[in-house]
């Protein structure tokens, strides 16, 4: 699956056509009020491009939350999004109370030129994800012929298809892979994601550094192994570092995270790194806490001293930060996935913050810096660095699966150039 050879919106002829666009409007809500409109704002360039280039209509579809195939308009309706979209676009948005069926097909068949239409939550139908639950909460699977009918109805709502929902690209859901139209392009958000991951995974500049944090080795095995085939350097930090250090250095790790499953493959990982000539940097000192709590008593430890019984490593220390700074300064391409400590708590955020500062500095000197989604993207938001790195991915799960070397169904379904 080549990321850089997929059809993109700027190469798609939209004039006079109805564009059906899969977007990610899965925004946080409180009492039916949107608390963060970032994802809606992010879709505006693709929508405006279609309107500015003479599209007859833009029909938008998205999921919101996890209604599991049960219509829950009181809790998971996209109606508030239509209101927000209207104010961001400065034009009317027609909101439909369903996403498939005769009435929806009729409304989208011959809309007034320049119309913007938002469909109701795709996940009110079990056929979107292929599984869900019935109103009583019992798990159910969608019937194949009903999935086919659902996809056929969606396919009638547009003449060309655009996918701008990278965050769901790792899911083979109906709206991602089942719209049957001859031209299927990535929107601008999706294109930016694919461009940056292509830079990292298909033709990287070197030295290439991967920084991998997070809690469990077992969760990151596939990621570590795939990246070891691509990078020159790797920093391993976060909770999973303690498993490596215990196995490799026989370090006393106190009550720190230890991953029994992951421990079994630490030596395999190190052998692969050695074979590929990849240098792995681990933390050498730690900020510790006497409990897993924001107000824990704070201590310090080194690999040599070990961590006292009952205490746990919750961040890396100042010597580790110096080592990280040296490794980052040499790189020309950096992919970072996973924080180095419990960054949500100030006492244990310094390691991740120091690394973020170095990444920002490297970016300003021309290094390409790609931040995987999830917690690392949250760090960028917390320290206001989203515009100071090359790219912050909008898809936690999707970016992780790409870095693991997996094929994303939502990307594979797009037309090739």
Curated annotation (Swiss-Prot):
AMP binds at residues 215-216, 220, 239, 313, 344. ADP binds at residues 214, 238, 343. Disulfide bonds: none annotated. ATP binds at residues 215, 220, 239, 313, 344, 375-376. It is an enzyme of class 2 (transferase). Gene3D superfamilies: Phosphoglycerate kinase, N-terminal domain (3.40.50.1260). GO terms for cellular component: cytosol; extracellular exosome; nucleus; sperm fibrous sheath. The keyword NADP does not apply. CDP binds at residues 214, 219, 238, 338, 343. The modification Phosphoserine is found at residues 2, 4. This is Phosphoglycerate kinase 2. The lineage of its organism: Eukaryota, Metazoa, Chordata, Craniata, Vertebrata. The gene is PGK2.
């Amino acid at each position: 699956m080549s990321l850089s050879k997929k059809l993109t919106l700027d190469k798609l002829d939209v004039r006079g056509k109805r564009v059906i666009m899969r977007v990610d409007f899965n925004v946080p809500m409180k009492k039916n009020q949107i608390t963060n409109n970032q994802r809606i704002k992010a879709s505006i360039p693709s929508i405006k491009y279609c309107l500015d280039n003479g599209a007859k209509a833009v029909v938008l579809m998205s999921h919101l939350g996890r209604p599991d195939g049960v219509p829950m308009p009181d809790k998971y309706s996209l109606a508030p999004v239509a209101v927000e979209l209207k104010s961001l676009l400065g034009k009317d948005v027609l909101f439909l109370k369903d996403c498939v069926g005769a009435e929806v097909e009729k409304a989208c068949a011959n809309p007034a030129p320049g119309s913007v239409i938002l469909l109701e939550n795709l996940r009110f139908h079990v056929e979107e994800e292929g599984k869900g639950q019935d109103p009583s909460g019992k798990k159910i699977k969608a019937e194949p012929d009903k999935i086919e009918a659902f996809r056929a109805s969606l396919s009638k709502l547009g003449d060309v298809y655009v996918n701008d929902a990278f965050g769901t690209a790792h899911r083979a859901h109906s709206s991602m892979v089942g719209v049957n139209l001859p031209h299927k392009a990535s929107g601008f958000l999706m294109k930016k994601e694919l461009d940056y991951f292509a830079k990292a995974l298909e033709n990287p500049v070197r030295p290439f550094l991967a920084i991998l944090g997070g809690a469990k080795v077992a969760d990151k095995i596939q990621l570590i192994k795939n990246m070891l085939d691509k990078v020159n350097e790797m920093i391993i930090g976060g909770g999973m570092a303690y498993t490596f250090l215990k196995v490799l250095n026989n370090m006393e790790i106190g009550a720190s995270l230890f991953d029994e499953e992951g421990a079994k493959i630490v030596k395999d990982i190190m052998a692969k790194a050695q074979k590929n000539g990849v240098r792995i940097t681990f933390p050498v000192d730690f900020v510790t806490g006497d409990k897993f709590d924001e107000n824990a008593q704070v201590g310090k430890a080194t690999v040599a001293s070990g961590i006292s019984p009952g205490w746990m490593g919750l961040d890396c220390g100042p010597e580790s930060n110096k080592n990280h700074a040296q490794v980052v300064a040499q790189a020309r391409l950096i992919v970072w996935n996973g924080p180095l400590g419990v960054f949500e708590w100030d006492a244990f955020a310094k390691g991740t913050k120091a690394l973020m500062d170095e990444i920002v500095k490297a970016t300003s000197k021309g290094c390409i810096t790609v931040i995987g989604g999830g917690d690392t993207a949250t760090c960028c938001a917390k320290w206001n660095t989203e515009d100071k790195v090359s790219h912050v991915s909008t898809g936690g799960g999707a970016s992780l699966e790409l870095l693991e070397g997996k094929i994303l169904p939502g990307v594979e379904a797009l037309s090739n150039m």
